[in-house]
């Protein structure tokens, strides 16, 4: 058996785990967004 690729991308999973709403739900998530805004990131979350 060969080893399979461990990254099997799924859009729904990506957005549920790393999305904007998930970030806004927790205090630390909001800190992440604030840091990324301060840095001037074009994209804040997945």
UniProtKB/Swiss-Prot annotation:
GO cellular component terms attached to this protein's record: ribonucleoprotein complex; ribosome
Coiled-coil parts of chain: none
Pfam family, one: Ribosomal_L34
Disulfide bonds: none
Signal peptide per UniProt: none
Membrane-crossing residue ranges in chain numbering: none
Family matches, as PROSITE patterns: RIBOSOMAL_L34
Any GO molecular function: structural constituent of ribosome
Any GO BP: translation
Matching InterPro entries: Ribosomal_bL34 (IPR000271), Ribosomal_bL34_CS (IPR020939)
Alphabetic keyword roster: Ribonucleoprotein, Ribosomal protein
Gene3D superfamilies in UniProt: 1.10.287.3980
Family: Belongs to the bacterial ribosomal protein bL34 family.
NCBIfam families according to UniProt: rpmH_bact (TIGR01030)
Protein name: Large ribosomal subunit protein bL34
Species this protein is from: Latilactobacillus sakei subsp. sakei (strain 23K) (Lactobacillus sakei subsp. sakei)
Taxonomic lineage from the root: Bacteria, Bacillati, Bacillota, Bacilli, Lactobacillales
């Amino acid at each position: 058996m060969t080893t399979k690729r461990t990254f099997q991308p799924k859009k729904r999973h990506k957005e549920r785990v790393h999305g904007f709403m998930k970030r806004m739900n927790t205090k630390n998530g909001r800190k992440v967004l604030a840091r990324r805004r301060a840095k001037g990131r074009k994209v804040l979350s997945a």
